[in-house]
Amino acid sequence: MGELQSIGNWWMWSGFGVFVLLMLAVDMFMLDRNGAQKVSAKEALIWSFVWFAMAMLFGAVLWGWLDHTAGREIADTKVMEYLTGYLLEKTLAMDNIFVFVMIFSYFAVPLEFQKRILVYGVLGAIILRALMIVLGAWLIAQFHWVLYVFGAFLLVTGIKMFVFAGHEPDLAKNPLLKWVKKHMRITNEYHGDKFWIMDKGVRWFTPMFLVLVLIEFSDVIFAMDSIPAIFAITNDPFIVFTSNIFAILGLRALYFLLADMAERFHLLKFGLAVVLMFVGTKMLIVEWFKIPVAVSLGVVVAVIGISILLSLIATRNKQH
């Protein structure tokens, strides 16, 4: 048993927490100011770039501070871990977005309601990841062998994802959705943006509630993938948390950017599967062979980049 070493102190954690709350407020204000109007691709692209720039700026500031206080070697290592974790989590977030698109399409969710659901989706993702990071860090500190459990889980998940990447899940057969429909009264129509209504003293849940349940359930599933994956890169809770949160903060802007382009990135899931298999293997062989962080970053960049490029080429060839 032991305690995980972290570069984060109380004021860094507090400062980052305040920053996250401010950025969430900015995100909600900027994307909701047009009401029910669709967020344009241009606006979504600008905000996606802003979030990316902020993540890179944080990395630069972190490197400068560590270089001054802890030395160049630690600064290089920690920022490399941060960048690798950020890229990995951003890719998982993109896959999460494609699931959101599928859910919204299945339930024909009106645009103005999508914005509200996405707020809960982002908040749920942040809260779940924070809780799972705390749990994961505690488990690793108490039981080092948990890393091997994480590694095996990621390896199996990656293999399953690769095998079934071309199969679109049938939401009508989703066990959770079937259970909710069986045990709760569900209306056939939307009632504004309400999750339930009262009719003659009886509570009825609306399709909005079903969408919310599936969105939050998808958050749980993706958190179960992402947290073990980031712990394959670093055991530092501060690096794990900051890279995760920066990857999620721009989720709504990224959704409006990619929502109409989900089909163009159909090979991304194969790339993500390969990455998960890589990080799972990395965790399983760490006792015998430690893969440098720079190599991990290179593998993640190469695999994701190639999968996106091949997706675009395949889509272009199909159009011609």
Describe these PLM feature segments:
Residues M1-H320:
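Multi-pass alpha-helical transmembrane bundle typical of ion/small-solute transporters
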